[in-house]
Amino acid sequence: MTDTLVAEKAATAGGVIHLGDVTKVFGKEGVAGSYRAVDHLNLDVASGQMLALLGKTGCGKSTIFNMIAGLTEPTAGTVRVNGKNPFAEFDAFRGKIAIVFQGDRLLPWRTAIQNVQLGLEMLDRPPPDRKDTARKWLIKLGLGGHEDDYPHQLSGGMRQRVSIARAFATNAHLLLCDEPFSALDESTAGKLRGEFVRLVKENGKTAVFITHSISEALEIGDRIVVLKRPAMIAYDVSFDKDTSLEERMMIRERIGEVLAA
């Protein structure tokens, strides 16, 4: 079996995300305290793809995430989202990239529906449209009847549902997810993962999902990229709903070997 067992690397020029020969160094390289987080990384993500970035702590997942989000720029190389530089043209991506964090990051003085409306307010959507859109997504996430609850009145899983609703409500095409279910119990996380994948596919979104869990990567991704420090691709595999259980087990085994090496 090869590393492209199920499919060729599903990343081509013209995709939503392009990272070309990207290097990121924190501090001045060669000087004490400097750190090379990403090393000559090449990665493309196709439209509609659900990419799971998998790796141990410190392998550069969050640095890649932040470069795609336009929160930091590479030391060298090219980062493009829909053909544009997300760092240099940050304002052009308002409403086009949505982020779901590990914590829900809800404003405690706002109700659930007001928290979902926050992104829409920043996009200057008219108030009636904001409220209707926020309500629609809360209902889709199973929170109908909780629109006027404050975060402290909601469980951890419910709060994360609000944060996911907030991301979808902006109608952003690209969703960036930084271990959004890691703080939840497995039963709650499992249900949310399934709903999240369904909504991404139903609404034609592209998603990049950071995780350190092989099981979560296999459950969420239709492509998994395994990173080894400093953020080099050690394994890249794509699969789909027709991939057999035997093939998935072999992929799991191979990922385990790569991470242990």
Go through each PLM region and give its residues.
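ABC ATPase NBD coupling module
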Residues: 85-101, 122, 127-131, 248
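Conserved ABC ATPase "signature" region
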Residues: 117, 121, 128-146, 198
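Conserved ABC ATPase signature
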Residues: 150-154, 158
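Catalytic Walker B motif of ABC-type/P-loop ATPase nucleotide-binding domains
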Residues: 175-178
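The feature captures the beta-strand-to-loop junction immediately N-terminal to the Walker
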Residues: 54-56
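Helix-to-loop junction immediately C-terminal to a conserved catalytic motif
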Residues: 69
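A short, proline-enriched helix->beta-strand linker immediately N-terminal to the Walker B motif
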Residues: 169-173
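Hydrophobic anchor residue at the start of the ABC signature
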Residues: 164
